[in-house]
Amino acid sequence: MEGVIVPLVTPFREDYSIDFEALEWHIRFLEEKGVHGIFVNSTTGEFTSLNTDERKMLAEKGREITSGMYLVGTGSTSTLEVIELSRHAEDIGADGIVIVAPYYCKLKDEEILKHFSMVAERVDIPIIVYAIPSCANPVPVDIIRKVSLEYSNIIGVKASVDSLTYLQELIEVKEERKDFRVFTGLDQYFLSTLLLGGDGGIMACANFAPEIHLQIWNSFKRRNFEEAIKLSRVLGEISRIYNVASSFASAVKLAMIAKGFPIKPVLRPPHVIDGEEVFNEIKGILRSLENVKP
């Protein structure tokens, strides 16, 4: 497991039901571009606004459509619900699950450890721990190291953490477990992650600009670092969409619409998609893509 993995948006119709036709179009588009994996029920996919049945239905439909590597997010505030969703993902043939630390209630380190341990003991499917302290309880590197060394099915981490020190410490876990995978969740950290010894990225801007991520990946693999750095600067510019929008999902969906993707400007309540002013700002930011060869 490596490379460019896309945390999918969840497209909705005007009545807030899941738009499975748009979902299928999007997955087909991304696989034709050559991404290395698809990830549903992600933060960008507004998983917290979906009920359990919808999350299972989305996971099932995504598995039917996706021909390549396929991940399902199974995070929740309830450890028992995580186990239920993880078993479901295993049953439908997902290649792995992504589990964020519980959110809303502040937890002690021992509780975070228990959460991941209980899930790992009850499923066989490969698990990626998701660290995103802006949205959930922070996951110390020591906990990630401990569970990855104790449980063979905990195979990696996705880190949406604005800290190169944290990222480097995660990559050092690979010295103790050679097959441990480290992915960044931040587009602007993609090249840095690869240079430090990481394995790829699970990045939201790849929903609408996978060509940039794939060109960075391919340039890095060819050791064309000059080209990779140039493209990384473009990706950093594109990442500014997060700064002008009110949420990841709003930023990415508006960027997709600006590029002509067949999705509707709808977020699940209570979230509201940003208006014309933000949309125009995002269109301006995306002009940096115009000079990049596909």
UniProtKB/Swiss-Prot annotation:
Compartments reported by the entry: Cytoplasm
Pfam families attached to this UniProt entry: DHDPS
GO cellular component terms attached to this protein's record: cytoplasm
Alphabetically ordered keywords of this record: Cytoplasm, Lyase, Schiff base
InterPro entries: Aldolase_TIM (IPR013785), DapA-like (IPR002220), Schiff_base-form_aldolases_AS (IPR020625)
Record's keyword annotation contains Lyase: yes
Subunit structure: Homotetramer.
Family, similarity comment: Belongs to the DapA family.
Name by which UniProt lists this protein: Uncharacterized DapA-like lyase PYRAB12600
Organism this protein belongs to: Pyrococcus abyssi (strain GE5 / Orsay)
Gene name tied to this protein: dapAL
